[in-house]
């Protein structure tokens, strides 16, 4: 059954109006709610993925935020840390693959988890995360992969819009966990401090670049 929480609207005069929505920590599955990615569906509801493998669908995201409902939409994913809605369907990036979620019987829960692309190489280390799923104006998908001993480690990865091809777009990162694509398909990536990276930074990407 859906779970209900409430939210608090942000101040509209601030540079960014940040709405705060309470998480349904008291839920039938005792599911942990380490939120990791979100995007909005055409009807104004939202999909939110959590690091422990769930995707939740939120409704009631109106101006009042008095009755925000949460329904677990998908579960069992491998540490999903990025989510993107394209043509009304949720795409989730996990350590293992991009998964496209389908609700075939329109009951509010995904019943088909499609392997959209699983060409990603992963050594399974403690920091072998894939994060931050976004798309460009041509429909290509992008995500970041933390450094490890594979050809895809420490890279910005691009996947074709049909899921048929995966390749490295840029490399040299440590543990990137932030990706944005702006006007003109300008791509920015945020790397994290540690090891050979003296401070957290944001870089503007160029194809084939080393950062």
What are these regions (language model features)?
Residues 1-211:
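Beta-propeller domains with acidic blade repeats across secreted/periplasmic ectodomains
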């Amino acid at each position: 059954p859906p779970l209900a929480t409430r939210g608090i609207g942000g101040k509209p005069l601030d540079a960014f109006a940040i709405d705060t929505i309470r998480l349904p920590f008291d839920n039938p599955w005792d599911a942990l709610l380490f939120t990791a990615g979100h995007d909005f569906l055409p009807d104004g509801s939202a999909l939110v993925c959590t690091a422990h493998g769930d995707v939740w669908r939120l409704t009631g995201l109106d101006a009042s935020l008095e009755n925000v409902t949460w329904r677990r939409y998908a579960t069992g994913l491998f540490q999903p840390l990025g989510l993107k809605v394209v043509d009304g369907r949720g795409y989730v990036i996990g350590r293992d693959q991009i998964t496209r979620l389908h609700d075939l019987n329109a009951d509010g829960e995904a019943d088909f988890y499609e392997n959209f692309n699983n060409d990603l190489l992963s050594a399974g280390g403690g920091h072998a995360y894939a994060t931050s799923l976004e798309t460009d104006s041509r429909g290509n998908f992008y995500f970041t992969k933390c450094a490890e001993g594979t050809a895809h480690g420490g890279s910005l990865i691009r996947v074709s819009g049909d899921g048929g091809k995966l390749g490295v777009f840029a490399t040299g990162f440590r543990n990137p966990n932030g990706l944005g694509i702006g006007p003109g398909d300008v791509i920015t990536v945020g790397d994290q401090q540690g090891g050979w990276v003296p401070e957290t930074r944001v870089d503007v990407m160029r194809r084939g670049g080393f950062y």
